[in-house]
Amino acid sequence: MCGIVGYIGYREAWPIVLKGLKRLEYRGYDSAGIALLNESGQNIYKKAGKVAVLEEFAESADRSGTIGMGHTRWATHGVPSDRNSHPHTSNNSKLSIIHNGIIENYATLKEELLGRGHEFKSDTDTEVLIHLIEEIQKIEQIDLLEAVRLALQEVNGAYAIVIMDNDHPDRLIAARKGSPMVIGVGKGEYFIASDATPIIEYTKNVIYLKDGEIALVTKDDLLVKQLDNVVQTPLIQELELKLEMLEKGGFDHFMLKEIYEQPRSIKDCMRGRIYPNEGKVQLGGIKEFAEKLKNIDRIIIVACGTSWHAGLVGEYLIEEYARIPVEVEYASEFRYRNPIITEKDVVIAISQSGETADTMAAIEMAKERGATIFGICNVAGASIPRLSHAGVYTHAGPEIGVASTKAFTAQVTVLTLMAFYMAQQKGTITTSKMIELLTELEEIPEKIQQALGSNDIIKEVAEKIKDSTNCLFLGRGSGFPVALEGALKLKEISYIHAEGYPAAEMKHGPIALIDEEMPVVFIATQNSSYEKVISNIQEVKARKGKVIAIVTEGDTEVKKMADYCIEIPDANEAFLPLLATIPLQLLSYHIAVMRGCNVDQPRNLAKSVTVE
């Protein structure tokens, strides 16, 4: 959600922090701000709107200083405005703070501080935190690091914070709980950020702060403590991220680039994990649990958004091939009820970023109740892999567009591999069948490349329906989660109201909406429910609905009925979700572009939802 950048060293901080905020724009935000320290004191610049607005606002201002921090805000407490933008200052204006997260007990703390004479300039929970830190430092007569440590013990909620002190212009203080934070290690300089994207062009050596850790950062040194005051020895890791991965590479938008990267990202996801000639899948991340997989009672998949749709595909695959019962849960709902969980359950947590707050809370609860946790994640070093007993990385590479594309197909690929691996362990699949499936799975990247070849046709279809106000997506079997994902993509980036349904459920309500103005997108590939989908198409046509069908290459039956057909290569039913998703991504993209929408940064959306 919010983006954080900090710098301390020998270079000018402004260009580093500003570029870092631009790198973090993909996370979603509504305002931006930067604070700098130099010989004359602290300078804070903040504006509602894009980073470019902030840059223009501060163009003629004093932007000197080798210590600075910046923030992109996604409003939670207080409307988007200049005064609610970060950084915020203490009552005496000597301390400043940037913050990602939510302080849940801020209202109670604010009342106490108001009673002690504090005056607030914003409506945010963040300003309350920096006032609390100042108050504790004043009353206890302690240094700032200790005041921060004590203050954080009084707050409930999640946070990643960076604090600057006018009286000590040679240091930054950073801390985190429930929100991500990474520290880049340079020579005579340190970088702080929400993720590694602002850091990669300066250093590949990073430290991922753990929950409940506080860091005192100077240009030459780093001290890390836990909230209980125990000093830690941080682990320095090397980033695999490359700078060119963060550029558009000639595409108009990151989303389009990432759609076209899917043949490669899926190949990367499978590399070293499938052996078609032997009919074997190897998943090193979960191999130590191979024996346990033979005796588990149930799998529970927890996720949010697009990852939840991937989980639904996983449910079909795991039950079909491994014959293990699967439940797919919204993490945000699962964590707030009292689910029955035993030590014979495996919980699979899916998150692109590995920092999704509700998913983290769900697996922490399941872990406490004895379940084994497997994580599926795209970001090495993120929180969910660290919280999990084992897991599998998707290796999709950085995904900058807010609307997920290649991360979704990589998650589905990993779930496919997990389904086959579990089937292999349980003996529910023959070697000959596995050879057949893996041989075809190896061909999927090339088939996705073929599906991308329909881009011009998809663009023509987009032109025909771009002015619609509603759209329905229908599918059966594993085509249902594809329909859900197609609807989500369209509403996310084009702002057209869209819903996904099982095709058979159409007559239980949605059919009332169908008329000549309603586009209905069918996942109508030649699978086990093909004939039933044809009947559903006929029902829509009888009510004059406009039918757009995703069909298997060479299909003639659906073409007789549909207004528009988009072909994908033929494939085993297990792999159709990977192929059928591609034209829906392109359709949503082109409609959004034609409507003049901000494709990479849709309104009100955040790439990584790190608050509940």
Where do the PLM segments sit?
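Generic C-terminus detector
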Residues: 229, 546, 559-561, 571-612
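Active-site phosphate/pyrophosphate-binding segments
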Residues: 262-266, 270-300, 390-519, 592-612
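Glycine-rich oxoanion-binding loops at beta->alpha junctions
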Residues: 49, 66, 70-83, 277-290, ...
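Conserved short alpha-helical segments that host acidic/polar catalytic motifs at enzyme active sites
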Residues: 1-252, 264-297, 336, 431, ...
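Structural beta-sheet core signal
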Residues: 4, 36, 97, 163, ...
